[in-house]
């Protein structure tokens, strides 16, 4: 038995891929440890969507060189999107690396590990395959038994936004069969999962190429799984969000009242250069469908500032969009050139100082809106799915007759709350429980409250409780 450590950089898709990698290594008879210094096998699951993510990955791999010199038998593997993009260049740049494996190579990794261990090979595997390896998805690792979790329903992307490398490093869009997805969710629910997030680069186009059921139909089937309390999904491309999907928020009781719908910009001129294939007005119409189907719907988005050619007027249109929509949260990024992405060759690059000013102004606006929306919840009772003990549990102001927990509302707001001892008796409150929490304080990025009740086991549908 060997010990392994996995370091994950990037999106939820990478988190899910790392859980699959953990399951593969566990099935090989190895066990997970908490630090690379303790491990015989060290894997870095990388991201290349932005320059900063690449820097994090290469910096971590560089730190492994000294460990490898001290323990030459240690096997180092680099996987994920950066591995897919750079391939053999990573092997040449980092002599400490033994295996470079791309986004389609997880199922072949056991053979590569054996080849390194027994023959001393150095391996690059960035081959892409048309079919999804369901044998990998069927494995359940030691880290797949949490209250909340991710499941990939598709991989790849066919949209080719001009700033993005995903179609080049994840491949073309391919959907998993609904039966395989449902079986995996049922297995995870049997292990304690209560909230699932369905993952894809564009979940709205699920099944279209293969002639499978629509994404709305898939959600309806997931909604029927006993023991599952909540359903979330990400990411949605605005151009493919349908009235059928919006209507699902009215009919499906487990579907959470939150949608992440990346706008990227509020300017039609910038959206066209990005190849987003929708206009500002079309985007706003999709939001109207969602809010009409589910009043109180929480909305989050992605925004890129400083895209090549973005003028001050373009940026002001983005700020205006944020004011108009009043998002609950925003993931904002400064544009950076990426290898393979067409925008790298675009004229009109925005200088770094201007990008810094724009992202500061954007975040200042959004922080104000988020704080206002959180304060508006004070005095309301929210249903919270308990995920674990709050980091605040050790604070001096937490008294002996209370316990501090954390979880999320259906609108995806973090809620930290105290549970009076009389309510906590009998272990009714714990990870996986659904608790009614009175919000006492709306903070900048979270809510604080006190538990006032606990849902009965099996009372899962809380998607419309805000």
Swiss-Prot record:
Catalysed transformations (reactions): N(6)-dimethylallyladenosine(37) in tRNA + (sulfur carrier)-SH + AH2 + 2 S-adenosyl-L-methionine = 2-methylsulfanyl-N(6)-dimethylallyladenosine(37) in tRNA + (sulfur carrier)-H + 5'-deoxyadenosine + L-methionine + A + S-adenosyl-L-homocysteine + 2 H(+)
Family indicated by similarity: Belongs to the methylthiotransferase family. MiaB subfamily.
Keyword Isomerase: no
Matches recorded under Gene3D superfamilies: Methylthiotransferase, N-terminal domain, tm_1862 like domain
Residues that hold [4Fe-4S] cluster 1 according to the record: 11, 47, 81
TRAM domain boundaries: 375-453
InterPro entries per UniProt: Elp3/MiaA/NifB-like_rSAM, Methylthiotransferase, Methylthiotransferase_CS, Methylthiotransferase_N, Methylthiotransferase_N_sf, MiaB_methiolase, rSAM, rSAM_horseshoe
CDD domains: Radical_SAM (cd01335)
Protein's name in the database: tRNA-2-methylthio-N(6)-dimethylallyladenosine synthase
Assembly and oligomerization: Monomer.
Lineage, uppermost ranks: Bacteria, Pseudomonadati, Thermodesulfobacteriota, Desulfobacteria, Desulfobacterales
Summary of the function given for this chain in its UniProt record: Catalyzes the methylthiolation of N6-(dimethylallyl)adenosine (i(6)A), leading to the formation of 2-methylthio-N6-(dimethylallyl)adenosine (ms(2)i(6)A) at position 37 in tRNAs that read codons beginning with uridine.
The keyword 4Fe-4S is annotated on this UniProt entry: yes
Cofactors: [4Fe-4S] cluster
Pfam family, one: Radical_SAM
